[in-house]
């Protein structure tokens, strides 16, 4: 029997889930939080390159002059994203270096070395809400927390293998385990997306059940290949860098793979 279309885990999750109260609170907290962040003026190519290299996620407005309305638009959303670096450049050499031929807002992210552009009609019709949504949905990091917003960026990433750490963020061991998970993520940058799934969030139960995991088996690692729905799981007591590395290497080599082709096993996928 054929497998379902690829990437169904995240796509169907998006179509059936609303933002959890925790996610809404987090977005509100970031927009209401302290700080007086301002976009950095990037006057030459070297400055732009260093600016992008220093940030996990950077947003740059490339404008042909400094009077375009989008300049004030960037200023209006900066405080909503305390963990994103913002820059503005009107230097022709910088625009040429990044293949910019018209007013454009670009998001650069370290995790998959991606440049995503808002240009043309998308740029002309942009407002603060659309710009915020663009940043939110593409704000992927070495470790990205899984929710209805970030799932969009995960779905659109060119990296087809995703490693999930499924763990309750309220756990006393969470911060230490997350740190080691982040260290492991550096070993697979550009090859595997590392994702955190908070098992304490009710809306994540369907994503967890996709991997046939029970709450008693958590925390756990789950690895998933979007191109052909191959996946595998590993219940753990704690995150160890070497353990994560071996699990990922084994999956990349085709060891210990599971594939959901049985009709009775497709139920949870359909319901996601």
Swiss-Prot record:
Protein keywords: Endoplasmic reticulum, Glycoprotein, Signal, Unfolded protein response
Region (PDIA3-binding site): 229-232
Any matching Pfam family: Thioredoxin_6
Domain Thioredoxin: 38-151
GO biological process, one term: protein folding
GO terms under cellular component: endoplasmic reticulum; endoplasmic reticulum lumen
Chain ranges for the short sequence motif Prevents secretion from ER as given in the UniProt record: 269-272
UniProt-annotated glycosylation sites, renumbered to this chain: 99
PANTHER family attached to this UniProt entry: ENDOPLASMIC RETICULUM RESIDENT PROTEIN 27 (PTHR18929:SF193), PROTEIN DISULFIDE ISOMERASE (PTHR18929)
Quaternary organization: Interacts with PDIA3.
Protein name: Endoplasmic reticulum resident protein 27
């Amino acid at each position: 029997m054929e497998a379902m279309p690829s990437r169904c885990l995240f796509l169907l999750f998006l179509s059936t889930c609303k933002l959890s109260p925790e996610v809404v609170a987090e977005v509100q907290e970031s927009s209401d939080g302290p700080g007086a962040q301002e976009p950095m003026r990037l006057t030459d190519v070297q400055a732009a390159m260093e600016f992008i290299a220093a940030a996990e996620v950077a947003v740059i407005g490339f404008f042909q002059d400094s009077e375009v309305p989008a300049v004030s638009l960037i200023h209006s959303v900066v405080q909503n994203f305390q963990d994103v670096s913002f820059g503005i450049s009107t230097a022709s050499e910088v625009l040429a270096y990044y293949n910019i031929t018209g007013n454009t807002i670009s998001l650069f992210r370290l995790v998959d070395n991606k440049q995503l552009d808002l240009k043309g009609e998308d740029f002309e019709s942009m407002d603060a809400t659309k710009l915020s949504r663009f940043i939110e949905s593409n704000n992927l990091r070495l470790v990205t927390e899984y929710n209805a917003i970030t799932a969009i960026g995960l779905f659109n990433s060119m990296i087809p293998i995703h490693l999930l750490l499924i763990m309750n963020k309220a756990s006393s061991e969470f911060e230490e385990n997350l740190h080691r998970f982040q260290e492991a993520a550096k070993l697979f940058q550009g090859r595997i997306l590392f994702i955190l799934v908070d098992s304490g969030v009710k809306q994540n139960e369907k994503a967890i059940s996709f991997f046939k995991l029970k709450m008693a088996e958590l925390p756990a690692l789950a690895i998933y290949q979007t191109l052909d729905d191959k996946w595998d799981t590993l219940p753990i007591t704690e995150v160890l860098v070497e353990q994560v590395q071996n699990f990922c290497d084994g999956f990349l080599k085709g060891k210990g793979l599971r594939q959901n082709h049985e009709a009775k096993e497709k139920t949870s996928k359909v319901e996601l």
